[in-house]
Amino acid sequence: LSPTGYGDSPYQSCSAFAGNPYFIDLDALKADGLLTAAQLKAEKWGDDPLSVDYGTLYTSRYKVLRTAYAAWREKYAGLHGCAHYYPDDYYAFALANDSWLNDYALYMALKTANGMKSWTEWPREYRLRDAAALAKFAAEQEEEIGFWKFLQYEFATQWKKVKDYANAKGVKILGDIPI
């Protein structure tokens, strides 16, 4: 269930805690009013229904997920007089996952800003986790960092529903963690 890395291998994940955005149900985002059928249909998802084209999937899925994130931000913008107010369960999720979520989101924002290259190829101040450079980057990239947190929130919300359903039917789900 972890994000896949190079070659889409689950054993080359960048996180032992994060969920794979590939598993976010786009129809659920549509049902929540964050996507439209037209937005989903407009994307190219691959030519062969019997084979997964991960390159195409990556490009299309993240484009659609960014659209959903923009709609989510818009949906909650200005509520309670706040520029960025989100549902209570989002804050509960962020607090419960504080031990890894902020670093993961910062890492993914840095990875995106650096053309998805390995962290070993990033500018020195990021490779060595210079606190001032990271704080400056985080302040400048608040929306991008928020995107990666949103994906984890959506993944966790949907995963809990699947797991609860399976458990209610007497199905136990087992897995392993990449190390």
PLM features per residue range, with description:
Residues 1-179:
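Acidic/aromatic-lined carbohydrate-recognition and catalytic surfaces
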